[in-house]
Amino acid sequence: MEPTVAPGEVLMSQAIQPAHADSRGELSAGQLLKWMDTTACLAAEKHAGISCVTASMDDILFEDTARIGQIVTIRAKVTRAFSTSMEISIKVRVQDKFTGIQKLLCVAFSTFVVKPLGKEKVHLKPVLLQTEQEQVEHRLASERRKVRLQHENTFSNIMKESNWLRDPVCNEEEGTATTMATSVQSIELVLPPHANHHGNTFGGQIMAWMETVATISASRLCHGHPFLKSVDMFKFRGPSTVGDRLVFNAIVNNTFQNSVEVGVRVEAFDCREWAEGQGRHINSAFLIYNAVDDQEELITFPRIQPISKDDFRRYQGAIARRRIRLGRKYVISHKKEVPLGTQWDISKKGSISNTNVEALKNLASKSGWEITTTLEKIKIYTLEEQDAISVKVEKQVGSPARVAYHLLSDFTKRPLWDPHYISCEVIDQVSEDDQIYYITCSVVNGDKPKDFVVLVSQRKPLKDDNTYIVALMSVVLPSVPPSPQYIRSQVICAGFLIQPVDSSSCTVAYLNQMSDSILPYFAGNIGGWSKSIEEAAASCIKFIENATHDGLKSVL
């Protein structure tokens, strides 16, 4: 691995020993969390010049695993300093010492606060930005901070919206499981080796203990080998010190096909509090697991059947947190996108156009779409796959299907109703049913505006179908190279499916398999802290219905 350490960066390298591994020979997630927290703390103190403590940790997604004998390298640095707190970027890679091949294990962001002596006031110095990537992370740090600050309000709002989904007292159904047997309690006495150099219990050690009890809880449900896939955003509510007794309570909250969420609550007791039974709530965290059987195949978890009101609260909370995680994927774990697209070849226009249409139909037919929002005329669904997030917006429109098709297939009209579109022009009329457009979109997250080159393929219904199709995907056109004024971006698969309800109304479904460049426009809505999708959908409905009332219906 590259040994060079950038200014302000801290590098930790560890050879994975048997003591660091679980029963399957893989690096314990708890051990990795300890190393990550230590490295991040040292990076924070390198910038601040005084002691710092962990305040919170953003979502952590483990993209791979590491095994005994491999080398783990952890790099941490401050991305942005605020008045008395800092965001720390943590990147973990693993290398096989025999082949030299290295892989990314995870990217995480944590927040540290300074711990001055006495009443000393501290104002942190700004971070010196030297590369373009550092400037990007610096801008995104502000967005991530907004997400952290509004997290509790966002969660509360989603919980209020979801109260109608299910009665809190339910009877058992076939193929479901209750969570009573997954409850786990454990206690730890904080000793000097568990404390950091400030005298407080080491934050990474608390994370490791939480991971241990959560793993036991998950194993009681799956009867297999659970492994930690991600950790939800959490913050430390208060400190603990040497001599404290820490009590950990874990229980399964909900399952989502191949994953399970386990909640862990941590309370701290000093000697007096222990005798009185009055502890301090210092942390709550939510850990998401996958599991494999003896053949290393992913296990499908049984659906959870909430019985009590407390079961129901935890069940609904897990659904809300999952939705928020989907929206946070861009701002928490931003990956620099390398724009891709199909190379446009006029001699293969028929094949490329058909691929465009079939991709949209395949996306719509996938199973696993989950509803996130229901309004009077609008329903929003999301589909989470291994490496992709897709959104579907269904709109009930009081206009004939052919009118909606005529309006939505003409992308030059899209800026009239879509607030994200600035301009849209035809640059190649390929055929009567296929056009290539150049599109410019609005600025998001303070970055440069984005532009796209897309193929739009439209299809009227066949005899055995009644669906109008408008599909689009990015293409690479040498005559329209990237411009330094814009960020050339990608549409993987998107479009409209329009079906008549009767002679005067239709259902319009908009689908988009989101690339990293598209996700910023949708992240807030998916995560629950924005209403941009609902607003665009309402604008689309109004645009189509107004056009009908203005006489377009008679023209057609």
From Swiss-Prot:
Q: Show the GO MF annotations.
A: acetyl-CoA hydrolase activity; ATP binding; carboxylic ester hydrolase activity; identical protein binding; lipid binding
The principal location of this protein is cytoplasm
* Induction context: By 2-(p-chlorophenoxy)isobutyric acid (CPIB).
Query: InterPro entries recorded for this chain?
Result: Cytosol_ACT, HOTDOG_ACOT, HotDog_dom_sf, START-like_dom_sf, START_lipid-bd_dom, Thioestr_dom
Q: What is its EC number?
A: 3.1.2.1
Activity regulation statement: Allosterically regulated by ATP (activator) and ADP (inhibitor). Cold labile, it dissociates into inactive monomers at low temperature.
Which residues does the UniProt record annotate as the domain START?
341-550
Protein's cellular compartments: Cytoplasm, Cytosol
Q: Please list the residues that bind CoA.
A: 54-56, 83-85, 145, 235-237
Pathway recorded for this protein? Lipid metabolism; fatty acid metabolism
Assembly: Homodimer or homotetramer.
- Protein name in the entry: Acetyl-coenzyme A thioesterase
**Organism encoding this protein:** Rattus norvegicus
